[in-house]
């Protein structure tokens, strides 16, 4: 299938490996699955009762990458989709999702992606989700993802979320339940500007002995934007968790970081850290001595901070 230039540009921004119509993939555009493919070990099926797909990843999957991006380019559209991932015991898979909105009109464009992961035992899953907005229109670009994750015994789940730019409003809801011996790493990166608003609520329940979680949030707030982070780690067994939230605040922005730790077992070990601050003037001065102006120096510092 030949894609138009807007779709190609948005896909380039949200799919770091480059979207290709090869292997297992599904491209959703303006509320319709416009193209999809299966591989030997990954099958994608359209839901019968509502919008969305079921992705079946069998136990013999070894390092395969599945691409399931979403593009919204119709002003005034509200797109709601339900995607369920069924990952068998022992599978090793990379999943690249994400959504980009191009809004050139005066009406809001919105995408709500509801993803549920059912992960078996001894599996390795790397999930990457990027959000991006663009367009010259006055209509807002809104993204509200909901992610529910069930991590089976001794499985490893890595989740990298990035909001690049251009998203006027987002509310992210993430719930994760972990069984014995499972490991979780979540890295969240976010940049807001102008009057954008972003809320991220995350709840991690360590329900099995020996489970461990690391949650890292890094953000930059510019202009008059507002950010709120509320990561919550609940330890019901002998487990480990570490929450770290770091933010750079600029101009007239507001950042609220509310890490919450909840131990319900004497052997639960949970740590949280949170820091909010402005760019260090000494760092700016040092870069300016190398010939950069203030804006360029800020750009270098922000890029290194988010990376």
Can you describe what each PLM-predicted range is?
Residues 297-298:
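Small-residue helix-packing motif on alpha-helices
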Residues 9, 23-29, 34-292, 302-307:
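Conserved beta-strand/loop scaffold segments within soluble protein domains that form the structured core
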Residues 1-3, 9-11:
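Terminal domain-initiation and capping elements
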